[in-house]
From Swiss-Prot:
Keywords: Ribonucleoprotein, Ribosomal protein. Belongs to the bacterial ribosomal protein bL36 family. The lineage of its organism: Bacteria, Pseudomonadati, Pseudomonadota, Betaproteobacteria, Burkholderiales. GO terms for biological process: translation. This is Large ribosomal subunit protein bL36.
Length: 37
């Protein structure tokens, strides 16, 4: 899980979603998991 100020899609499987006001990236590749913080 990467915590970054700006979350970006890395590959075409990445999806940007909002959970409880937190922007997250979910992907089939676990290395692409990110959240904004």
């Amino acid at each position: 899980m990467k915590v970054s100020a700006s979350v970006k899609k890395i590959c075409r499987n990445c999806k940007i979603i909002r959970r409880k006001g937190v922007v997250r990236v979910i992907c089939t590749d676990p290395r692409h998991k990110q959240r904004q913080g």
